Design a protein with these regions (language model features):
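Core segments of cupin and vicinal oxygen chelate
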Residues: 1-49, 73-74, 86
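N-terminal beta-strand motif that seeds the catalytic metal site of vicinal oxygen chelate
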Residues: 1-22, 62-66, 109-122
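Vicinal oxygen chelate
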Residues: 1-4, 6-15, 42-44, 48, 53-77, 79-122, ...
């Protein structure tokens, strides 16, 4: 058995747009951003974290992180639902839904909120 939940909404921007986008989303939320490497937290939406991510390359986009206490089990569950693994990286897996929308499966990142909201899967 394992647990998972959608935990993070990420607004991704390449470096040349990142600072302006970060200021914008922090303003939308009325918060001061909390940077952590390529990520910066700009508050919460209900029980979800909202973050702005600096991309090395690629187009601006929004993606979800599904956090799990067992990444391989969650990836297998999502593949059975029709998801596709695009890339396995150290500590997370990049996947796509049946329509091609990209998302990530990551370890637990939201602490107590994960414990409160995660669903348990067989």
């Amino acid at each position: 058995m394992h647990r998972s939940r959608i935990g993070i909404v990420l607004v991704d921007h390449p470096g040349e747009h990142h600072d302006a986008a970060l200021a914008f989303w922090a303003g939308v939320q009325g918060v001061r951003p909390s940077p952590d490497g390529p990520y910066a937290s700009v508050g919460e939406i209900g029980s979800l974290n909202l973050e702005v991510q600096r991309l090395d390359e690629g187009q601006p986009r929004v993606h979800l992180d599904i956090e799990s206490d067992d990444i391989p089990a969650e990836v297998a569950r999502l593949e059975a639902l029709g998801g596709t693994v695009l890339e396995r990286r150290d500590g997370y897996v990049i996947m796509a839904d049946p329509g091609g929308v990209v998302f990530c499966v990551v370890g637990i990142q939201t602490g107590d909120r994960f414990e409160e909201d995660a669903r348990e899967w067989p």
